[in-house]
Swiss-Prot record:
<feature type="transmembrane region" description="Helical">
    <location>
        <begin position="96"/>
        <end position="116"/>
    </location>
</feature>
<dbReference type="GO" id="GO:0016020">
    <property type="term" value="C:membrane"/>
</dbReference>
<keyword id="KW-0472">Membrane</keyword>
<keyword id="KW-0325">Glycoprotein</keyword>
<dbReference type="InterPro" id="IPR053018">
    <property type="entry name" value="Elsinochrome_Biosynth-Asso"/>
</dbReference>
<keyword id="KW-0812">Transmembrane</keyword>
<protein>
    <recommendedName>
        <fullName>Elsinochromes biosynthesis cluster protein HP1</fullName>
    </recommendedName>
</protein>
<feature type="transmembrane region" description="Helical">
    <location>
        <begin position="183"/>
        <end position="203"/>
    </location>
</feature>
<feature type="transmembrane region" description="Helical">
    <location>
        <begin position="160"/>
        <end position="180"/>
    </location>
</feature>
<keyword id="KW-1133">Transmembrane helix</keyword>
<feature type="transmembrane region" description="Helical">
    <location>
        <begin position="220"/>
        <end position="240"/>
    </location>
</feature>
<feature type="glycosylation site" description="N-linked (GlcNAc...) asparagine">
    <location>
        <position position="31"/>
    </location>
</feature>
<comment type="function">
    <text>Part of the gene cluster that mediates the biosynthesis of elsinochromes, pigments consisting of at least four interconvertible tautomers (A, B, C and D) that have a core phenolic quinone to which various side chains are attached and which play an important role in fungal pathogenesis. The non-reducing polyketide synthase PKS1 was proposed to iteratively catalyze decarboxylation between acetyl-CoA and malonyl-CoA subunits for polyketide chain elongation.</text>
</comment>
């Protein structure tokens, strides 16, 4: 069964694409302004939508094998927003090797910094009274501190470069990575940024004495910070539709983490999200992604902006 839907985002005619649903007892929600009279026929039900009218429809679908819905969008972002998409493996971002490389290097850096403080390898001026009282830290001379400085310098640069690299890879392939892998890359970049900042505890005097290295790192830190801020821009779309009073009419368990991250950037760039997206950002209830599903919840607005709180 094929149903053609027409949507008006104020842009040229789209190239139709196909979304296939393979779920039973699926409920599909349509909430759009239609550009022409459209007859929506799914299973045994038929609904006529008037041209130019803003309509909200909940269509119960009983599927034996599959239902194909041809939607006017390219790529299939509208179809994904309606039917969702399961996450597909992406070892280049979330593979064991990538994760191990980030975590092991982070643990090594943290262990090295803590050891330097505990064993007196840090500059004496960096050890405060609270460090001595609570962590039994000891200050050392410059000669002893220099033994760790070269190793920490290399590890610090590694964290800065890997954080920038993984975000650059995510930005370069937005249509090829899912929401799950996009947020995974952003979190790894945040980890790299935090670990890099921890190394500066032992490098303060060195960077103060070597200005050219200082400005190189300031430039890298600024670039990573800007990239991290930009990476958060589309996350408000996690609250892309306001909750209706009749929350039982919405899809409760729709796979969502597999939707391409580029879909959210595309809506953000066009600045034509559903009219109620602004209301959704400030309402007590909204759509959100959690554990690979789309659901309804009345949690804090912070979850709409910070990915770490939405899974």
């Amino acid at each position: 069964m094929t149903t053609t839907l027409y949507r008006d985002y104020g842009r040229p005619e789209y190239t139709p694409s196909v979304q296939t649903f393979r779920r039973t007892n699926l409920q599909v929600t349509y909430n759009e302004t239609w550009t022409q009279p459209t007859t929506l026929a799914v299973s045994t039900s038929t609904t006529t939508i008037t041209a130019g009218a803003f309509e909200t429809r909940w269509v119960d679908v009983s599927i034996v094998e599959s239902v194909n819905i041809v939607i006017g969008a390219a790529p299939n972002c509208d179809g994904y927003f309606i039917g969702g998409k399961n996450v597909e493996p992406n070892p280049d971002i979330s593979g064991i090797g990538v994760l191990a490389a980030f975590l092991v290097s982070a643990w090594v850096v943290w262990a090295t910094v803590l050891y330097a403080f505990a064993r007196g390898q840090a500059d004496a001026e960096q050890v405060k009274a609270s460090d001595v009282r609570f962590f039994r830290a000891r200050g050392g001379d410059r000669q002893r501190a220099g033994k760790f400085r070269r190793a920490i310098l290399v590890l610090s640069d590694q964290q800065l470069v890997t954080g920038i690299a993984i975000l650059a890879a995510a930005f370069a392939n937005l249509d090829g990575i899912s929401v799950y892998h996009y947020t995974f890359a952003v979190r790894l970049a945040w980890l790299s940024s935090s670990v890099h900042l921890s190394t500066l505890l032992l490098l303060r005097r060195y960077l103060r004495e070597h200005r050219r290295y200082l400005w190189f790192r300031v430039g890298g830190m600024t670039l990573l910070f800007v990239m991290l801020m930009i990476s958060l821009l589309p996350t408000y779309m996690y609250a892309f539709q306001e909750i209706n009073e009749d929350t039982t009419s919405y899809i409760n368990l729709r796979p969502a983490n597999g939707i391409p991250a580029g879909c959210f950037w595309r809506v953000l760039a066009s600045w034509r999200p559903p009219i109620d997206v602004v209301k959704a950002s400030y309402s007590p209830g909204y759509w959100y992604f959690r554990s690979g599903k789309v659901g309804v919840d009345g949690q804090s607005i912070i979850s709409a902006f910070i990915p770490a709180f939405t899974f």
